[in-house]
Amino acid sequence: MYAVFQSGGKQHRVSEGQVVRLEKLEVATGETVEFDSVLMIVNGEDVKIGAPVVAGGKVVAEVVAHGRGDKVKIVKFRRRKHSRKQQGHRQWFTEVKITGIQA
């Protein structure tokens, strides 16, 4: 059984027991989070597709940790001008463990 849900402007395909990194959520570590915007639920041959979301569909997860991703380097270079600009970015994330999928 797996589900596709939306969080932080992105869609995630998950199954029970899976650990997923999402955009940062303002929830404390160890708390439970419910995602109501479930787009699709598949249980063997039974497929439920929402228009746009599945009615009564829910993905339940437990917050495992918060952190920051790897550094992404941004470089702006102007040729022949002896000019260069360097910048870095580390995106915040929340790691959750999927504990249940309800149809």
Curated annotation (Swiss-Prot):
<keyword id="KW-0699">rRNA-binding</keyword>
<dbReference type="InterPro" id="IPR036164">
    <property type="entry name" value="bL21-like_sf"/>
</dbReference>
<protein>
    <recommendedName>
        <fullName>Large ribosomal subunit protein bL21</fullName>
    </recommendedName>
</protein>
<dbReference type="GO" id="GO:0019843">
    <property type="term" value="F:rRNA binding"/>
</dbReference>
<dbReference type="GO" id="GO:1990904">
    <property type="term" value="C:ribonucleoprotein complex"/>
</dbReference>
<dbReference type="GO" id="GO:0003735">
    <property type="term" value="F:structural constituent of ribosome"/>
</dbReference>
<comment type="subunit">
    <text>Part of the 50S ribosomal subunit. Contacts protein L20.</text>
</comment>
<dbReference type="Pfam" id="PF00829">
    <property type="entry name" value="Ribosomal_L21p"/>
</dbReference>
<dbReference type="GO" id="GO:0005840">
    <property type="term" value="C:ribosome"/>
</dbReference>
<dbReference type="GO" id="GO:0006412">
    <property type="term" value="P:translation"/>
</dbReference>
<keyword id="KW-0687">Ribonucleoprotein</keyword>
<dbReference type="InterPro" id="IPR028909">
    <property type="entry name" value="bL21-like"/>
</dbReference>
<comment type="function">
    <text>This protein binds to 23S rRNA in the presence of protein L20.</text>
</comment>
<dbReference type="InterPro" id="IPR018258">
    <property type="entry name" value="Ribosomal_bL21_CS"/>
</dbReference>
<keyword id="KW-0694">RNA-binding</keyword>
<dbReference type="GO" id="GO:0005737">
    <property type="term" value="C:cytoplasm"/>
</dbReference>
<comment type="similarity">
    <text>Belongs to the bacterial ribosomal protein bL21 family.</text>
</comment>
<keyword id="KW-0689">Ribosomal protein</keyword>
<dbReference type="InterPro" id="IPR001787">
    <property type="entry name" value="Ribosomal_bL21"/>
</dbReference>
